[in-house]
Amino acid sequence: MARILELGCSIVISYKDGYIHPDMKRLFYRNKQLAKDFQKCALPLLGACLFWGIGFTSYSSFMGHLGVDAAAANSVAAVVRDIICCFSAGISSAAGIMVGNELGAGNLRRGKLYGIRLLKISLVCGVMASLLMLVTAPIILHFVNLTPQAAGYLKGMFGVIAFYMIGRSVNDVTINGIFGAGGDTMFDMYSLAVCMWCLAIPLAALGTYYFHWPVVVVYACTCIDEVGKLPWVFLHFRKYKWVKDLTH
């Protein structure tokens, strides 16, 4: 229902002055070149979304296998993590608009400078989100109604999230915002295939079903992909393959 209302509001607002609104006459018009360019950028994003969605679902199954207390703690941790991630998600959207606008206007040098500055901002945002997690953790633990065992798991998970947020912030802004603005969408799919499906999921699965690691250690394995891909992200960023004008 929320998404339907959001779509309706977006369509209504799009007909106001200064906005681009749907043109029903051209809605089903097919431009072969535009479709080709769109598929080149969109298909890797579709693959990345599939990798990410299925991967996160498997994380929940690991926690569920570890018991009721682990599943309960993971549910609370997921909500808190998603709320804090709103900071990086907002900056990511802004980064895509700012960098994409400059690159599309042909201002490649300015777009590159914006990308560098936004990367630095994402680092600061990640550190702030990490500190926010550490500060609010005792307050959240005070208000949630969990068993002592689940509360202990949740406390450890909050510590993991504090480190996780630094990687998540940088990756959100850089991969989803800056790289996406320049059409460099293949990196997102590759990084998820390697760091999530070849690292995080196998480690978490082994820890859950074979080695029987502690709950917090398995949870840390499910978060290792965001931190593990950081060196790769920085290296790819400095290649500046994303500095290109997609309108030509």
Residue ranges and their predicted role:
Residues 1-43, 99-165, 206-248:
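Short alpha-helical transmembrane segments in multi-pass integral membrane proteins
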Residues 33-62, 90, 94, 123-126:
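Core transmembrane alpha-helical segments of multi-pass membrane transporters/permeases
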Residues 60, 73-137, 169-191:
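Small-residue-rich hydrophobic transmembrane alpha-helices
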Residues 178, 186-198, 205-213, 217-220:
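C-terminal structured "cap/appendage" subdomains that terminate the fold
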Residues 8, 50-54, 83, 87, ...:
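Hydrophobic/aromatic residues within the transmembrane alpha-helices of Major Facilitator Superfamily
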Residues 80-84, 148-174, 194:
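Alpha-helical transmembrane segments of multi-pass membrane proteins
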Residues 10, 55, 59, 95, ...:
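Hydrophobic/aromatic residues in alpha-helical transmembrane segments
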Residues 46, 50-83, 101-102, 141-148, ...:
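Helix-terminus/linker motif at the lipid-water interface of multi-pass membrane proteins
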